[in-house]
Amino acid sequence: MSNKEFALKKHEEWAGKISVESRCPLKTREDLAVAYTPGVAEPCLKIAENKDLSYLYTRRSNLVAVVTDGSAVLGLGDIGPEAGMPVMEGKCVLFKQFGGVDAFPICIRSHDVDEIVNTVALLAGSFG
């Protein structure tokens, strides 16, 4: 099997390089009541009073976006956002493995700089 065939096989097997997993236990009704409703209301109300508390009560302090429009992907050129996703996932894995930072790929279907900047600005409340 060639390196290219092996890479395709592994990417198909993995079906993506990253996943989202829970950091809190959800084994009992009490766990659910604390992590979701009604307990989730308390940090929401505190953050509503002071948005900086979102860094304390959420994963925002350790979550970054890896953003691309797919126009300049690792020497592959303009391959588009969907085709750039494997590279963005790979970058997210590097953030986690070598820096302990949770990263999430955002692949935008636009080459318009203003649209990209606006999209990132609109998403900023989710990332640190």
Tell me the role of every PLM-derived stretch.
Residues 1-128:
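N-terminal ligand-binding/catalytic initiation module
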